[in-house]
């Protein structure tokens, strides 16, 4: 079962709402976006994402994918990307795989809770409640966060929040 919700939060007044969309996530994760670990046998491709109406002053973007329902006591970070140039407004399907080089120049994918940089698809435990997968794009007031691909999700999140102008999210629920 997969449901999709869209949310947007802006730190400043704007005539247009900062939004995040995906041509790939129109109601459910398909096998190509599911992880290929922990008993899941998906294709582990990151979804296509697009955003628009970034606030004035945006100098870069960051993207995260987070599962707050993971049975860890602290959730699970599936994807962390930052230093996406301000003139980029989408990521192609599969951009989360560094080997295919679809990520914009200068963008950095840092460590996830899988212990490596790059996209790690959803794979909730069997027979668990539906998990929320929150994909968020952040409009930032700095061009570079000043960290590299070895940064932990917590450190990236801290620096993102210090530089936040606006954010928009997709929330997808998935159950195995």
Segments from the language model and where they lie:
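Bacterial N-terminal signal peptides
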Residues: 1-10
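N-terminus-centered regions that define maturation/targeting leaders and the start
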Residues: 12-176
């Amino acid at each position: 079962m997969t449901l999709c919700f869209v949310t947007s939060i802006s730190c400043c007044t704007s005539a247009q709402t900062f939004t995040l969309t995906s041509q790939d996530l129109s109601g459910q994760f398909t096998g190509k976006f599911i992880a290929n670990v922990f008993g899941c046998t998906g294709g582990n491709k990151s979804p296509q994402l697009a955003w628009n109406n970034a606030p004035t002053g945006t100098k870069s973007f960051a993207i995260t994918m987070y599962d707050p329902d993971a049975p860890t006591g602290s959730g699970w970070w599936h994807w962390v990307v930052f230093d996406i140039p301000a003139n980029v407004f989408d990521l192609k399907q599969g951009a989360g795989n560094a080997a295919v080089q679809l990520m914009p120049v200068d963008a950095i994918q840092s460590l996830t809770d899988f212990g490596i940089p790059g996209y790690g698809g959803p794979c909730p435990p069997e027979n668990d409640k539906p998990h929320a997968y929150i994909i968020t794009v952040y409009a930032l007031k700095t061009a570079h966060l000043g960290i590299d691909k070895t940064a932990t999700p917590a450190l990236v999140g801290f620096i993102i929040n210090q530089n936040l102008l606006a954010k928009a999210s997709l929330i997808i629920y998935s159950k195995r």
